[in-house]
């Protein structure tokens, strides 16, 4: 714990096109080497493609995809008497969003499609349909937490 004052979390400015803080955070996670305009162009193109496929609003389609990837529990290592246990803990709401976005971007980067915008659109549409690598990652994390439910009493 710091002895000085606790520094508050920085406020992220909303996305210029849709006015969404969630989308602005997503752009920041996708951004590489500080190239924000490139990241924004990729996200907007991907969202347009996603909206055309699903027939929904841009942000609504994005929200559905994000909802399907958000984890509710995860495991954290906890050392007790010489042995390390994987203890299941509930994920805070801010971390849920961050993990979901990170998993979607990582899964999109690993796909083999032509452009990053197309890869991202495909991953988001897969996530909206409850399939794809990002959803599999969430299910793996949930399965790990379920398997280690016996150690839940070590929570701190």
Swiss-Prot record:
Keyword Ribosomal protein in the entry? The reply is yes
Q: Does the keyword RNA-binding apply?
A: yes
Official protein name in the record = Small ribosomal subunit protein uS7
| Keywords noted in UniProt | Ribonucleoprotein, Ribosomal protein, RNA-binding, rRNA-binding, tRNA-binding
Organism field: Yersinia pestis
What's the source species' lineage? Bacteria, Pseudomonadati, Pseudomonadota, Gammaproteobacteria, Enterobacterales
Q: Report the domain of life of the source organism.
A: Bacteria
GO CC term, one of those recorded: ribosome
Q: Which PROSITE patterns match?
A: RIBOSOMAL_S7 (PS00052)
| Subunit organization | Part of the 30S ribosomal subunit. Contacts proteins S9 and S11.
Q: What does this protein do?
A: One of the primary rRNA binding proteins, it binds directly to 16S rRNA where it nucleates assembly of the head domain of the 30S subunit. Is located at the subunit interface close to the decoding center, probably blocks exit of the E-site tRNA.
Gene Ontology terms: biological process: ribosomal small subunit assembly; translation
């Amino acid at each position: 714990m710091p002895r000085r004052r606790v520094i508050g979390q920085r406020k992220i400015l909303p996305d210029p096109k849709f006015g969404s803080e969630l989308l602005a955070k997503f752009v920041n996670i996708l951004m590489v080497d500080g190239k924000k305009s490139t990241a924004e162009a990729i996200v907007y193109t991907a969202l347009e493609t996603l909206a055309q496929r699903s027939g929904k609003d841009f942000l609504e389609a994005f929200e559905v995809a994000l909802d399907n990837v958000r984890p509710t529990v995860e495991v954290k290592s906890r050392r007790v008497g010489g042995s390390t246990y994987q203890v299941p803990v509930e994920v805070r709401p801010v971390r849920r969003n961050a993990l979901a976005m990170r998993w979607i971007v990582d899964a999109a980067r690993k796909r083999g499609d032509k452009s990053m915008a197309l890869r991202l659109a495909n991953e988001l549409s897969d996530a909206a349909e409850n399939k794809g690598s990002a959803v599999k990652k969430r299910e793996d994390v949930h399965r790990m937490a379920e398997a280690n439910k016996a150690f839940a009493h070590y929570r701190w």
